[in-house]
Amino acid sequence: MILNCPHFQQQDCVSCQWLEKPYATQLTDKEIDLKRLISPFILQNFTEILPPVQSSQKQFRNKAKMVVSGSVERPILGILKDQTDPQSGIDLCDCPLYPTEFEALFPILKDFIARAGLVPYNISKKKGELKYILITQSRYNQSIMLRFVLKSEQKRPLVERELPNLLAKLPKDSVVSLNIQPQHAAILEGETEIFLTEKTTIEENFNDIPLFIRPQGFFQTNPNVASQLYATAQNWIKDLAIQQFWDLFCGVGGFGLHCAKALQEKNENVQLTGIEISASAIASATKSAEQLQLKNITFASLDSAQFALNEKSATPDLVIVNPPRRGIGKPLAEFLNQLGTPYLIYSSCNARTMAQDFEALSNYSLQKVQLFDMFPHTSHYEVLTFLVKKS
């Protein structure tokens, strides 16, 4: 076994379903899967399949999603082995995927739970307050975003009373919030976010690009591999004749900002339009662009497919898409196929739906493919592709 994980050995936690596979075998199996899915689009003497980007095999995650069970005096942070049994809590504070700094953080959180009287939510009795603790770390400055998911605001005064003591033990520039999730259901978070700190974002930095992480927003879980993913996209397009481009499903702007920075070093008039449904992600992307002092950048909170289908301005020279697992979908794929932009970058966490989208992109040839092992010890992976319009 690659990692010594007693939880896997005892079959208490099987999230890392490939833990018994040697790492080289994991990568080979992922490459075989990817090539099988995209084989209809691989062109001899044209499509370049680059070697996979490897991950660290431990301590690569920047976040933890901990179910809280046990008692207020002795909370258990980890998972429920049986979702319907509150007594089935498994403590995962020693999970080898977490950064080393989390080791010191978990005892601080357990102490805080007791001091603030945050009784763990009991799913069978429908009683208690604290459901989850969600933690994200910045690799850049080690600051922490700490979110307590509660059933109600009832314990807020006690939390605020104990907060100064907690903040004194957290890294500088950390963010603490309460997320209110009143439903009796296995839903990770609710809509209401109450910030207990002045700061509402933690700053990450990939390749000298500041990126701001907010609650309820998507951010890659493997920062070392993610930074290489963005740098690769930047490298692929930096010498192309691009005057304007779109970044669809842009999140906090990782792809668009990397590409805009490289392109504007040669031509400051290059224009970027970034589109993302999440308003908080767009606020983060806008903040990054301002900090980088980039010009001609527009980020807007819209549905990516609706934006593209209704946009009447000039055809962009490049479109970047980084959709969720479901892919970009047939209507958007067919639209992009007719739009005729010279270059497409498609980044995907689900090669199966990406391959389905490629079927509709019949006017394009697949020029480059690279696998990024964002999720070691599982069957999942990220893939970056570069497509060019057929002449």
UniProtKB/Swiss-Prot annotation:
EC number(s) reported in the record: 2.1.1.189
PROSITE patterns: SAM_MT_RNA_M5U (PS51687), TRMA_1 (PS01230), TRMA_2 (PS01231)
Keyword presence, Methyltransferase: yes
Pfam family, one: tRNA_U5-meth_tr
Active-site residues, record numbering mapped to chain: C349 (nucleophile)
UniProt record, GO biological process: rRNA base methylation
Gene Ontology MF term list: 4 iron, 4 sulfur cluster binding; iron ion binding; rRNA (uridine-C5-)-methyltransferase activity
Cysteine pairs bridged by disulfides in the record: none
Job description of the protein: Catalyzes the formation of 5-methyl-uridine at position 747 (m5U747) in 23S rRNA.
NCBIfam families linked to this entry: meth_trns_rumB (TIGR02085)
Name used for this protein in its record: 23S rRNA (uracil(747)-C(5))-methyltransferase RlmC
Organism for this UniProt entry: Actinobacillus pleuropneumoniae serotype 5b (strain L20)
Classification of source organism: Bacteria, Pseudomonadati, Pseudomonadota, Gammaproteobacteria, Pasteurellales
